[in-house]
Amino acid sequence: MQIKRWFLNNSLRNYQYLLYDKSHAIVIDPLKSDIFAEFIAKNKLQLEAILITHKHGDHIAGVKKLLAIYPNAKVYAYTGNDLFKPDIYVKDGSFINLGFTSFRVMYIPGHIDDHVCFLFEQERALFCGDTLFNAGVGGVQAESADINQLYDSLVKITKLDGDIKPYPAHDYWLGNLDFALSILADDSYFNYYRNQVAELAAEDKPIVNLAEEAKLNIFIRAMSDKALLKALPDYSLGREMFVKLRQLKNNF
C-alpha cells in the first residue's frame, strides 16, 4: 500500500496519514475528517479501517464524521473514549489481517496509558503516534503519563528492524534538534539534520528509517552514546540519562 501524508499547519503541527491501494483505504488518527473524505472520494476508495494510537483529542476528533460517511469502517483502538467505542479492541501483539494488508499492534505506554503503535511489516511502516518523534520523544504531561514506561516503550521500538520507517503524529523536527544541540553542540548528525530541515516545509521533511533515527535522536542515543557522559557526567547511560534528558526538554 502507498502512504499519503498531510501536514495540518495547526498549533500542534499535526501530520495526518492514510494508507491506500487501488480500492482500499486505512486512516490513522484522524483530526480533520474532510481531507480524508475528499481523498477517498476522489480516488473511489473504500474506507476499511480507522486506527487510533491513543485517545488525545487531536488524534480522534475526526472519527465520528468519518463514520457518518463510511459507517462500515471499523475502528481499532486500545480503549474507548467519550467520542466513540472501538469496533475492535487491540492489545500488545494483536495481529490484524485485512486481506489486502495486515498490521501488528505494539502497546507502548508512557506518553499516555492507552498508547499503541501500528506496525505494517509489508509496507515497512510504523505509525507511532506521540511516542517517537523525529529527533525526539513524546511528552509526559498527561495524568496517566509515566516517564519510565516511555523509556521502556522507546527501547521496544528500537528493537525493530532498522529499515522500518516511523511515521510520527507531529512535526517537531526543529525544536527537537535545537534541544539536542543544546546538549551536544558539535554533533555532526544533529547539525546536518538541523541544517537540512531548516529550509524545508513540513510537507517536505524527510521520512527516515529507524536506523537513521537512532543516529539523530538524542533520546535513543541516551541508551549508549558515551558523548552524553561528558555532557551530563552525573548520569549513567540508559534509563537515568533518558529521564534526565526528558526533564531538561520539558523546560527547554
Swiss-Prot record:
Belongs to the metallo-beta-lactamase superfamily. Glyoxalase II family. Zn(2+) 2 binds at D58, H59, D130, H170. Thiolesterase that catalyzes the hydrolysis of S-D-lactoyl-glutathione to form glutathione and D-lactic acid. Binds 2 Zn(2+) ions per subunit. Its cofactor is Zn(2+). The gene is gloB. It comes from the Bacteria. It comes from Francisella tularensis subsp. holarctica (strain LVS). This is Hydroxyacylglutathione hydrolase. Zn(2+) 1 binds at H54, H56, H111, D130.
